[in-house]
Swiss-Prot record:
It is found in: Periplasm. GO terms for molecular function: calcium ion binding; heme binding; iron ion binding; nitrite reductase (cytochrome, ammonia-forming) activity. It comes from the Bacteria. It comes from Pasteurella multocida (strain Pm70). Ca(2+) binds at E245, Y246, K291, Q293. This is Cytochrome c-552. The gene is nrfA.
Amino acid sequence: MVVFLFILYRQSDLKFKSMNGVIIVNTLKKRLFVATTMIWGLSVTLPVLAEYKPIEQPVEPANPSLKIESRNDLFKEKYPKQYQTWADTSKSTDLDSVNYEDPRVIVLWAGYAFAKDYKKPRGHFYAVTDVREILRTAAPMTPDAGPMPMACWSCKSPDVPRLIAERGEAGYFGATWASGGSEVVNPIGCADCHDTTSKDFAEGKPALRIARPYVLRALEKIDHKFDTSDRTDQRAALCANCHVEYYFAGDLKQVTFPWDNGITVDAMEKYYDDIGFVDWTHAVSKAPMLKAQHPDYETWMLGVHGKNGVTCIDCHMPKVQGADGKVYTDHQIGNPFNAFEHTCANCHDQSKEKLQAMVKSRKTEIKDVMLRLEDQLVAAHFEAKAAWEAGATKEEMKEALQDIRHAQWRWDYAAAGHGGHIHAPDVLLKVIGTGLDKSSDARTKLVRVLAKHGITDPVQLPDISTAENAWKATGVDIEKERKAKAEFLKTVVPQWDKEAREKGLLPAEK
């Protein structure tokens, strides 16, 4: 009966929420006294966040014998088809801003760099360019300036495993992002997936390799040791170089995958809670937040394709036939529908149009419930702010803030990924659904706290209908950020490229 009562008011609240962000608070108050009168003595107290105690991570020493050739342009002549299709990822030029498309995210990430600038992904060719230009990396004018650590380069370039081999993990991670500007200059390319210095590679064989030590360690945690995996698992694991959930551990800010308990949203959440890890404290609600990255490998493994051995490569890098009749792997990683006959049609009997309609429908359904969760979270953050302003104590707030943390972690797990609506739509819907439950739990608890401090009227939400309004509501001076970045791109980045050419890491200017 208790659970049934809660489900009743949650479903009703969600219908109101899609119409008006203020009405839901009032609706929630009315139902609260009906439902909680019967269950007050039966409520379960959830464990609150522990003090941060980072797990000590292995640190790989320098390995001078590991040779990594990170310059993509050196392989243009030997592998012209592969190189040209890789270069064709430059045709993916759109830089649509999620912040402008959906200003709610500015509130959800308030106090974190993603609130300033978050764009939809484009081709691997732009990996280095985009991380330089994004407002999130700020405008460090000297090598020692912050705020970002060296770890922020880790997914962007084959220069990263080269530097780790040369310096060791402590030497690589223990530096600022700005200090790597003239070293990390080649975008995601050949040496990220292949042993480009090996005899096998020279003879035209794939020579698949993962050279980032932290990735190899993570794969072992889930019994996917790369060296002993079969070819299918190895091909998929290459994408785990980057398309995974991770965090920066300890003072070293070492890239670490939270896979000790498994790869599900609950398993990773437990890992973070057990060690008390917090990405940032929310600027509005003061909740101890987690920021999901892009758990694509995890959702793929949990979905129908992963369970049936259909890998990332099968769908995004198919075998195609060149004009000379020879078959090669297409390196223009992108939408499988762009190469339908070589990807989807290998397994599916449906027409391209029918499959596209099915995928579009799933995407729309997931987006709809995701936006409902965003609305709940936006309201929860501002209701928490109102509770603090009314005099709430840390003890009174801790359970509601923990619910906000868990709810937004689930939203972000679904939102941050690429293609989850096709990789594992059932997984995403479940994740978002439990996020809605937890956001409702948070708001229920906040109503009690607000009432205890004399707040019985609905909490008025600020106008966040545009990105500019949302930045204003959360205290972001976006024009100041843009001006600083423009100066950085004008003065610092050209110097980085000049130094990289002097080191031989980039080809000479033509």
